[in-house]
């Protein structure tokens, strides 16, 4: 077989990860290796309840019902189109779809699996919202590994975020006084929110990333 971004496939591949005719369902097989798919897609009957309650569907041309229906076909061409599209990045992962599906599907999990595969195969770079994952990795992912937080007040620099206005600039310049009223250990070691995370805890966090494959995914 051929080895492509962590997957052994039975059959030849063209450049760019596209699968030749006659090897139907290989993208589907890749998706089914994601544990989220087993709970996310059981048996969609196209009722449309997920789309009706989806907040993202109110703002985008987005139909989670159609995404699940497409994946169910196991059609490589259709699934690849999803992997390269903007569509899979519209979901806010609120999981409103999860408790409402009469067949027990969770379209949000299917979208998560599609996003994961799109990133592993490099297809995410072909959509604007997909490419925004680079910014999220730098702005949030690296913050987690460095500080233990997704974001802290000191990371929202007014020079980089002028939309925050003059009030935020004042808060930023006086952050210890402002946030110190809520927690005396603000950005210091000790208990409480917004404390400085000690190095031992940060090392444990990094080890979790390494053991779960997160670090390899970050560096790929």
Where are these predicted regions, by residue range?
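Ferredoxin-type iron-sulfur electron-transfer modules in oxidoreductases and energy-metabolism complexes
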Residues: 21-35, 59-90, 94, 104-170
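C-terminal, charged low-complexity interaction regions
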Residues: 167-220
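Local cysteine-cluster metal-coordination motifs and their immediate loop/turn environment
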Residues: 40-59, 88-105
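Short, Φ-rich (hydrophobic/aromatic) sequence segments
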Residues: 5, 138-141, 209
